[in-house]
Regions:
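Conserved, well-structured core domains of diverse proteins
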Residues: 1-131, 138-142, 654
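Long, contiguous bundles of hydrophobic transmembrane helices that form the permeation core
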Residues: 2, 6-45, 329-431, 534-623, ...
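Transmembrane alpha-helix interface/packing and boundary motifs in multi-pass membrane proteins
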Residues: 221-225, 256-265, 297-303, 443-446, ...
Length: 655
């Protein structure tokens, strides 16, 4: 039996020690376009390494001594990034195998650097003639916009290109549009002047955040990965829950929650921990569709888990106008509720199929793990402490980088060599490219929205569609975020929905942080929402399951993420908004009880298998507890209490 299981795991492209076959790696890279960059050999690899090292050192320098003037910082950031994108996402991959750059890619890389370098060289002149766009400026600006769009196609994907082009077209064809969507229209000169030569477009807030906070946090994550912190998380999760019913699946949930504290990518999280946890779940007896779904749901939650959430969380702090630490504090309780919801789903599935955990004798002892690997958590603890102490995210991330290198030196088996430190600089720069280009693309969207006023028009249209019905407006906003999230990266998705949908919610009295967090959540959860569920597709690629069924199972497990945003809009106290200890506790407890009911309904199990009526009652009772009114809370508790009692006594009789 063990041999059959082993063969089954290996057939899906994962060996016993978690190593993935080339075919599986290729599949996963296709799903995670941002990490699907070329691996050159020879002199080309050295050229890439030098550019990446210079890029990372520039970011570290400005992090240490302070960012340069906004436009200069962002232009240098874009110059490095866009050059690397054209070299690392080549026209013809056959040239990569031969260890050569394609001449077209080299030419495009040079061409793409000309617009930001033009701004750097002519910076003082551009300031003196602010608002005046010369013919040369127009040509350079058009070139810059076109090169960014092509870079986005290469490293982010076609959907964001389509969205950006739609907004650009809207800017041009405003006079020909019907009704409230019509506007005077923008000339090429006006559009280029606004999008490329101000800090309202390409070089706007998203690029500003990318060139300061985000890059350094990605670099910090690269060094934490080099130390082996991911393995420490899996070992700790094994010690906590490996022995319990359905142990390996619970290990996946806990390790992904911990991994999410340092990573902001759903697919990367699935790939990072799924190669170990998914085979473990399959060996225990979980169906391959469910095993892939567990990892997908847990890994997607990583972007919701502080202190390092997705790149969009840094943008949220800027858009809302609050310190990043306030976003982190607001996100803590909802993130914990989400992972409890996934954990409950896993637990009920294990009980339903009588799946046992790993014997304690086969698990590593707590003491040994902490003794050998505990020092790896020092950087994470330090960065939380620094953020809580009032350090800016940029300074905290910079300190975290140096602390991660220093703490790794405490034991010989984790000590970094000079080549490891250099490799961290290279990996950090490569890892930042997708976010960088997504931010520059998102900047164009913001530029068109602010220049044409379409944001307010669409927000008003959303309110009209919902006919002033608050719940219907929330539902329309949710659908918009989910649809955008199916093909557009979280960063761009958040930018679009926060400029269009969030104002509609705010106009009806929703606190600004709650409105932004609402669209943020649904943009992320799109990664497990069929039909385009990238995290679920990655999980199914490792498990060998059906992508669509894996996505459906992941959505069931992650049902909390579809409910929690409604909770913090209806009860903003859960985000710490105008909250007292009593109100936060009450909202959290009722939401938690509701989560038990909804998870039980999704899986069809509590103490024993639930029938259709019980599942409907569990769902209804759980949803009642979302509404903050006392009446609905009482109804929810009574309904759930009745089902729990029926289940309990029926399970006793069956024994």
């Amino acid at each position: 039996m063990a041999d059959l299981e082993k063969k089954n795991v290996q057939a899906e492209g994962v060996s016993e020690n978690g190593e993935m076959s080339e075919e599986l790696q290729k599949k996963l890279k296709e799903l995670d376009k941002e990490s699907n960059t070329a691996e050159y050999k020879g002199i080309c690899a050295k050229v890439i390494a030098v550019i990446c090292i210079c890029f990372s050192l520039f970011q570290i320098y400005t992090g240490f001594f302070g960012a340069l003037d906004a436009m200069i910082q962002r232009c240098v950031h874009l110059s490095f990034g866009i050059c690397l994108v054209y070299l690392l996402c080549p026209t013809k991959k056959a040239w990569v195998k031969e260890g050569r750059f394609h001449p077209i890619d080299v030419a495009l890389a040079v061409l793409a650097m000309i617009p930001p370098i033009y701004i750097l060289v002519n910076y003082q002149q551009l300031i003196l003639r602010a608002g005046t766009v010369t013919p040369t400026d127009t040509v350079i600006g058009v070139l810059g916009i076109v090169m960014i769009i092509e870079a986005a196609r290469r490293i982010v994907g076609l959907p964001i290109v389509i969205v950006v082009c739609c907004f650009l077209a809207y800017g041009f064809f405003g006079p020909y549009l019907p009704g409230p969507l019509a506007h005077r229209g923008l000339t090429i000169k006006q559009m280029v002047g606004h999008l490329f030569f101000t800090t309202e477009g390409v070089f706007g807030i998203p690029m500003g955040v990318s060139s300061t906070f985000i890059f350094l946090f990605i670099l910090f994550g690269a060094y934490l990965e080099k130390t082996g912190l991911g393995k420490f998380f899996i070992d700790i999760a094994n010690a906590i829950a490996g022995w319990a019913s359905g142990g390996p699946a619970k290990v996946a949930v806990i390790s992904s929650a911990l991994q999410g504290t340092i990573s902001g990518s759903s697919v990367a999280n699935v790939v990072g921990s799924g190669s170990f946890t998914i085979p473990m779940m399959k060996k225990l007896g979980y169906h391959k569709n469910f095993a892939g779904a567990v990892e997908a749901a847990a890994s997607t939650g990583g972007q919701l888990m502080p202190p390092i959430m997705g790149a969009a969380a840094f943008l949220m702090a800027e858009f809302v106008g609050i310190p990043y630490m306030e976003v982190v504090k607001a996100a803590i309780v909802p993130a914990i509720l989400y992972f409890i919801g996934v954990f409950l789903g896993v637990h009920f599935e294990a009980k339903k199929n009588n799946l046992q955990g790993t014997p304690r004798s086969e698990l590593p002892p707590w003491g040994k793990i902490l003794k050998e690997e505990g020092h790896l958590a020092i950087p994470l603890i330090a960065i939380i402490g620094l953020l809580a102490s009032g350090y800016t995210p940029m300074k905290a991330a910079l300190a975290g980088i140096f602390i991660s290198i220093a703490s790794a030196m405490l034991r010989a088996n984790t000590r970094m060599s000079i080549s490891d430190i250099i490799d961290g600089l290279i990996k950090g720069a490569r890892g930042a490219l997708g976010v960088l280009i997504a931010c520059s693309s998102a900047g164009m969207i913001i530029g068109i929205v602010t220049k044409t006023g379409v944001g307010l028009k669409l927000a008003s249209a959303l309110v009209d569609i919902a006919a002033g019905n608050f719940i219907l407006l929330l539902f329309c906003t949710m659908i918009t975020s989910l649809i955008l999230g199916m093909g557009v990266p979280t960063t761009a998705n958040y930018v679009i929905t926060s400029t269009i949908a969030a104002p509609a919610l705010i106009s009806l009295g929703v606190p600004i942080l709650a409105a932004h967090m609402f669209v943020f959540y649904f943009g992320i959860i799109a990664d497990i929402t069929p039909p385009v569920a990238l995290a679920a597709f990655a999980g199914s690629a490792i498990s060998g399951g059906d992508p669509l069924k894996t996505g459906v199972n992941a959505s069931k497990l992650g049902i909390a993420a579809f409910i929690i945003p409604y909770v913090f809009v209806l009860s903003p106290e859960i985000l710490g908004i105008n909250a007292t200890l009593f109100s936060v506790t009450e909202t959290t407890i009722t939401a938690l009880i509701g989560m038990v009911g909804v998870s039980g309904a999704m899986i069809g199990q509590l103490y024993c298998k639930a029938n259709i009526l019980e599942r409907l009652l569990l769902l209804a009772g759980g949803l009642c507890l979302i509404d903050p009114t006392i009446l609905t809370d009482i109804i929810g508790v009574v309904v759930l209490g009745g089902v729990f009692a029926m289940q309990y006594f029926r399970s006793k009789k069956s024994k």
